[in-house]
């Protein structure tokens, strides 16, 4: 009788383990394939917003980049999450923490020549599939070329990783200005097709999770698979919008004064 009870007990343990394993697989499947739809209260939105310091740093970085590239006749456009922010929020997405822009391959050498100007403003410059301009926050400059009727990344690894990140000829040009917080930036002529490819239902829902969202380490697996219904609070851009420094003109003025002083001394 004791031997029979032991066998039954062993079978029960095996059965329980199988049930638990099946439950884990089912839960994993749900997380991978099923999206949750949630409406956040205004108070809950604050949980996901980037800090005010980070927002100010991002706007300053975008302002400095816009002014340096424009001053040096390098045409650029905002793209990816930065473009989504300009279209949907008229500024930085409140839970985004970097900036993305593109330039044409023909302007890459010119860009390389002016990178020291970013360093004069206190930014560090590096390259890994894109040019990275960083201080407290980072901006990526992607290099693009035209292939048939599409503008695509020149970097093959980026093309393979983000096959939907492209513009058709009529979508990109002519570039136009977008409101971006308290400043204006350049972006594509018609962004809708590009946004639809990258962010389906972007005009109805926001997805908080991004692999580089370092300010959100607390996100649960469920939150990562949640589409948050857009509310007026969620549509507000990252804040504050300013005040922003006039760094590019200040550096240029300082250089002019030094040159003038050197001439005067001679």
UniProtKB/Swiss-Prot annotation:
It is a single-pass membrane protein. One of its GO terms (cellular component) is membrane. The keyword Membrane applies. The chain crosses the membrane at residues 13-33. It is found in: Membrane. PANTHER family: LIPOPOLYSACCHARIDE CHOLINEPHOSPHOTRANSFERASE LICD. This is Uncharacterized protein RP689. It comes from Rickettsia prowazekii (strain Madrid E). The lineage of its organism: Bacteria, Pseudomonadati, Pseudomonadota, Alphaproteobacteria, Rickettsiales.
């Amino acid at each position: 009788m004791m031997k029979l009870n032991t066998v039954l007990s062993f079978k029960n343990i095996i059965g329980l383990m199988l049930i638990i394993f099946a439950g884990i697989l089912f839960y994993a499947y749900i997380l991978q394939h099923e999206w949750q739809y949630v409406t956040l209260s205004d108070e809950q939105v604050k949980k996901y917003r980037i800090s005010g310091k980070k927002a100010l740093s991002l706007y300053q970085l975008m302002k400095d980049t816009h002014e340096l590239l424009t001053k040096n006749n390098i045409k650029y456009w905002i793209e990816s999450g930065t473009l989504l922010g300009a279209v949907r929020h008229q500024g930085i997405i409140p839970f985004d923490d970097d900036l993305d822009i593109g330039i044409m391959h023909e302007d890459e050498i010119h860009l390389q020549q002016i990178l020291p100007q970013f360093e004069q403003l206190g930014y560090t410059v590096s390259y890994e599939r894109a040019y990275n301009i960083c201080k407290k926050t980072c901006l990526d400059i992607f290099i693009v070329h035209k292939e048939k009727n599409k503008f695509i990344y020149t970097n093959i690894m980026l093309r393979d990783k983000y096959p939907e990140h492209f513009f058709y000829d009529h979508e990109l040009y002519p570039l136009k200005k977008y409101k971006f917080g308290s400043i204006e930036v350049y972006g594509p002529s018609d962004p809708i097709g590009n946004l639809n490819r990258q962010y389906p239902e972007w005009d109805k829902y926001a997805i908080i999770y991004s692999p580089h969202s370092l300010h959100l380490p607390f996100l649960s697996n469920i939150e990562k698979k949640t589409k948050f219904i857009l509310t007026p609070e969620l549509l507000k851009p990252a804040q504050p919008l300013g005040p922003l420094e006039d760094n590019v003109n200040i550096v240029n003025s300082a250089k002019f004064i030094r040159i003038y002083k050197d001439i005067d001394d001679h």
